[in-house]
Design a protein with these regions (language model features):
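Conserved P-loop
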Residues: 2-90
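Phosphate-binding/switch loop-helix module in NTP-utilizing enzymes
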Residues: 66-128
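Residue-level preference for the first positions of well-ordered beta-strands
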Residues: 1-4, 31, 95-96, 128-130
Length: 131
């Protein structure tokens, strides 16, 4: 299953975390890959340390990202994060996999949209994926 949360402002990450919380109530594991973020002080990063069913990997860096001219480091981190996501989805590493901020990565062409869409379509029955 694929769920896509879009729009401006707050609520997308919170909605995904709500699904993760509900899933944990049924004994399901969640993996959250957080693109464009790397700050251990984010609330979700702090909470993840106390939740054995919830794994958070921040696959971005704690720096401003120039979406019009992204730094090669940011592009590589997005690519590496996407490769990690593909492995997790393919291997069913968790019951719920949240790809936080992936929509921004795609909208700013930091990853090829068609590649991501094709992969997610091909693996839509593996796990529940939220972007």
């Amino acid at each position: 299953m694929l769920q896509v949360y879009t729009g401006t402002g707050k609520g997308k990450t919170t909605a995904a975390l709500g699904v993760a919380l509900r899933a944990s109530g049924y004994g399901m594991k969640t993996l959250m890959l957080s693109f464009l973020k790397d700050d251990p002080e984010y609330g979700e990063a702090r909470a993840a340390k106390n939740l054995p069913w919830f794994t958070l990997r921040q696959v971005g860096r704690d720096a401003f990202v120039n979406f019009h001219n992204p730094d090669p480091v940011d592009l590589k981190m997005c690519r590496d994060g996407w490769e990690e996501a593909k492995k997790a989805i393919s291997s069913h590493a968790a019951d719920v996999i949240i790809l936080d901020e992936l929509n921004i990565v795609l909208a700013t062409q930091m990853l090829p949209t068609q590649e991501v869409v094709d992969f997610l379509r091909e693996h839509k029955n593996n796990v529940e994926v939220i972007t």
